[in-house]
Regions:
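A short, small-residue-rich loop immediately preceding and capping a beta-strand
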Residues: 83-105, 109-120
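Short glycine/serine/threonine-rich phosphate/pyrophosphate-binding segments
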Residues: 44-47, 97-103, 122-125, 244, ...
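ATP/NTP phosphate-donor binding region
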Residues: 1-89
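C-terminal charged capping/lid subdomain of soluble metabolic enzymes
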Residues: 171, 282-353
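Solvent-exposed alpha-helices and their adjacent loops that cap or buttress functional pockets
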Residues: 5-7, 30, 82-85, 106, ...
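Active-site segments that bind and position negatively charged phosphate/pyrophosphate groups
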Residues: 194-301, 305
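A glycine/threonine-rich phosphate-anchoring loop and its flanking beta-alpha core
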Residues: 108-203
Length: 353
């Protein structure tokens, strides 16, 4: 009889105001006192002194630190094997690029990875995969769930609002992704892990029920970040991204191929979640309320996104992951989604012809 499976969870999980200035103490408590630091482009000037002072005060030795602006897998392999042998951890501070680069470098060297996101734009900071350029093509490659996640809500608050909107879009996508996963199992094309469903569902429900006056409220940001972190754990349990990535993500990935300059991942995903929630006839009022009340739609209306691009993306979606069987893998639901793009009142307001 199979007892169960082993899974990794973060040993360090610190999300709150001022967390970045306490990073040294968090690392020292785990005996991670020899580290390599990677900062996102321009972030040494913004956060370098705060981080270095915290590490120095707690006698955590920085073996080397650099700014990174690449997700090319060849660059990262070279970087990984230049990490000193006595390093005990790799730390990435910044956005998606440097998080993915550091995560993969740590994976190659079998070192603990500490994820320190400076924006809330997606759940990538907590995921066990990295989005890298492989022979010029954006590719999701396996890595490992972060050993530590440290997020300073004050840092998140001072980032441009578009990153918060992106995080909101990525978070609510769990509503449609979970429904796709269950739909897939019913079609005989996959197997749902009930515990992963529970974790992902609890994450999104905790977020969408949070009271707030502003999207920069401490409680709102903490709930958003907590929930994004839980999403990564749901994927780890499932052994895939199915609990958090469904038809709405396929639309976004298709838009990445169609658009010369794609929008932030979570912005595209948020719009696609609204479309798919209506197609699925599943919790679309909740999705609509969150997007309206947070100001997400007002932001989207400034982006001049085109209806025609979404129509193309819906048709392209099944080819992005042909092994899946989401709602969009069936023609009748693709047609329903396209009809919605053409006729829905909200989409008519925020998308252009």
């Amino acid at each position: 009889m199979q007892i169960g499976k082993e899974m990794a969870i973060p040993s360090i999980l610190k999300i709150g105001n001022g967390a970045l200035g306490k990073i040294g103490g968090y690392l020292k408590a785990e005996n991670l006192d020899q580290v390599v630091l990677f900062f996102g482009n321009g972030l040494i000037d913004m956060f370098g002194e705060l981080v270095m002072n915290s590490l120095k005060e707690t006698e955590v030795n920085v073996l080397e630190y650099n700014e990174l602006d690449t997700v090319d897998i060849d660059d990262i392999i070279t970087l990984a094997f230049a990490i000193p042998n006595k390093a005990k951890a790799v730390i990435s501070i910044g956005g998606g690029k440097v998080i993915d680069a550091g995560k993969y470098a740590a994976f190659l060297r079998n070192l603990p990875f500490i994820s320190v996101p400076t924006s809330s734009s997606s759940d990538g900071f907590s995921s066990a995969s990295a989005s890298l350029l492989v022979q010029g093509k954006r590719t999701s490659v396996p890595a490992r769930l972060a050993y530590g996640i440290i997020v300073d809500t004050q840092v998140i608050r001072t980032a441009p609002e578009k990153f918060i909107y992106s995080g909101i879009g990525d978070m609510i996508s769990k509503i449609t992704a979970l429904y796709d996963w269950i739909f897939e199992e019913k079609a005989g094309c996959g197997e749902v892990n009930d515990f992963a469903v529970m974790i992902a569902k609890k994450a999104v429900n905790s977020f969408v029920r949070t009271p707030y006056e502003s999207i920069k409220d401490e409680l709102f940001l903490k709930e958003l970040l907590d929930s994004l972190a839980m999403s990564g754990i749901a994927n780890e349990i499932a052994g895939s991204s199915a609990p958090t990535s469904g038809s709405e993500h396929l639309i976004s990935h298709a838009l990445d191929k169609i658009l010369e300059v794609p929008q932030l991942h979570g912005i595209q995903v948020g719009i696609a979640t609204y479309i798919m929630a209506k197609v699925q006839d599943h919790r679309y009022i909740r999705v609509s309320t969150v997007l309206q009340d947070t100001g997400f739609w007002d932001y989207v209306a400034t982006l001049h996104m085109k209806r025609s691009d979404f129509l193309k993306a819906i048709d392209m979606a099944p080819s992005i992951k042909p092994h899946r069987h989401t709602y969009l893998h069936e023609e009748k639901y693709r047609e329903a989604a396209k009809k919605l793009v053409l006729e829905d009142e909200v989409l008519s307001r925020v998308l252009e012809d």
